[in-house]
């Protein structure tokens, strides 16, 4: 489950899976009834695609040395901005520390696994 920047407000259910040795993440369900239904602000092939099914994590590769997933990209569908990405699994994969970088700036979100 992804959360807003306040870390308390759930925004979406995101399914994260391996595909061809990389992690991808797709929105499975939007939890905010006020949010847009399509990614109108996206600038690439995701422009105007439905939020449900939208691939927001692309290309993260496993770094066995430190256990992180690196060199990926994460999309903020609210404003269409794409960030460099590092994912650090914690608590046996039940928690993901998601860090997006834009230049020298970054922000971190904590995502929690839902269901089986």
Q: Which residues does each PLM region occupy?
A:
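N-terminal glycine/threonine-rich, aromatic-flanked beta-hairpin/loop signature
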Residues: 10-62, 95-104
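A generic structural motif
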Residues: 3-5, 17, 75-77, 99-101
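Short, hydrophobic/aromatic-rich segments at coil-to-beta transitions
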Residues: 65-73, 93-97
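A charge-rich, low-complexity, intrinsically flexible signal that marks solvent-exposed coils, linkers
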Residues: 81-82
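Tryptophan-anchored aromatic micro-motifs
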Residues: 1-10, 23, 27, 70-72, ...
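Functional cores of ribonucleases/endoribonucleases
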Residues: 73-74, 86
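Edge beta-strand at a domain terminus
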Residues: 93, 101-116
């Amino acid at each position: 489950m992804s959360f807003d920047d306040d870390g308390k407000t759930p925004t979406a259910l995101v399914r994260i899976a391996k595909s061809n040795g990389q992690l991808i993440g797709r929105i499975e369900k939007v939890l905010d009834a006020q949010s847009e239904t399509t990614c109108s602000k996206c600038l690439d092939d995701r422009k105007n695609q439905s939020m449900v099914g939208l691939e927001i994590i692309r290309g993260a590769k496993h770094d066995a040395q430190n256990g992180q997933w690196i060199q990926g990209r994460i999309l903020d569908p609210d404003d269409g901005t794409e960030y460099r990405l590092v994912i650090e699994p914690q608590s046996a994969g039940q928690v993901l520390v998601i860090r997006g970088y834009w230049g020298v700036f970054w922000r971190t979100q904590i995502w929690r696994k839902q269901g089986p």
